[in-house]
Amino acid sequence: MRVLRAILIALLLFPQVLRAQFSFDPGEGCLNVVEFTAGPGLGALGDRLIGANYLHERFINEQFSFGAGAGYSYHQQYQFSALPVYFSTHYFFVDSRFSPFVNLKAGIYWMLGPKNIDTFLKYSISGNQPGLSLFVSPGAGVKVHLTSHIGLMASVSYDGYLANAFDSAKNNYHTTMVPNLGINFGLCFQIPGW
């Protein structure tokens, strides 16, 4: 009797397994990503950072999505927090369970609570730093679907924050990108109809 029950349950579930897709359906809602980032600085002006982002993108087709996002990051050596707001896009190379992708985030950020101001030391920010500045983050990674509406993403990105930073080689402040290597892990999901 137990064997018969197990076979019956397996047969009932089998069509569901066959129907389960391992990619997002553009007609079923937007791509949502909650992402956590950490990474070292790059070059002489780079800085370690930790952060989190939320992205909400609309599918243009099965491989391309476009939308907006917002986040928070803390820059450890420059001692400031950043609140970026940006446009975001993903391009998935294949429509399958495992899909490599490239993405781009570009927008502005607000610098909050800088502590290392006008010290004329490495990792110092000028007091003339504007309240809003440029943020850009190109990246590449892989998406792995767990179900038809939930997946995991892992990527590497170049996170650039335009800042009026002290350059110890030139012994003055100038506007430059503060570069970081972002190592990103995220949960992506699709809520039908949203």
Per-region residue spans from a language model:
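Bacterial Sec-dependent N-terminal signal peptides
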Residues: 1-24
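Short glycine/proline- and aromatic-enriched beta-strand/turn motifs that initiate or cap beta-hairpins
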Residues: 19-66, 186-194
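Gram-negative (and chloroplast) outer-membrane scaffold detector with strong preference
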Residues: 55-137, 144-150, 184-194
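Transmembrane beta-strands of outer-membrane beta-barrel proteins
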Residues: 33-39, 69-71, 103-107, 155-157
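Predominantly the C-terminal beta-signal and adjacent terminal strand-loop region
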Residues: 146-194
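Extracytoplasmic loops and strand-loop junctions of Gram-negative outer membrane beta-barrel proteins
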Residues: 35-39, 120-126, 167-170
